[in-house]
Amino acid sequence: MNVILTHHAGVERIDRIANCLALFGMNEFILEIKESSRLFRLTDTGILFVFDETGSVLITGYMATPEKVASMYKRAGYAQVPRNTWSVITRNSRTYRMKF
């Protein structure tokens, strides 16, 4: 996947994105929702990437919060967050919330 980084992602937030990838890794996107002109893509390891509406420009990336993930699943039409995903998100939040 070829992605262009915005100045924000490539300069201002690159350390945060790199730390998330180093701590959590990244296997695959498990959920994608569109909000206004942005695509929010959640990975199975709990990283949330924000892209432009085409999905080719990365705006930012960060550790997903339980609140954001619950909101995303609700917007996608799910009654609740899948158990495995919720476990990952809440564990990350408890363990790493002060690091980011």
Predicted features, each with a name:
Residues 1-100:
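Ribonuclease/tRNase effector modules and their secretory precursors
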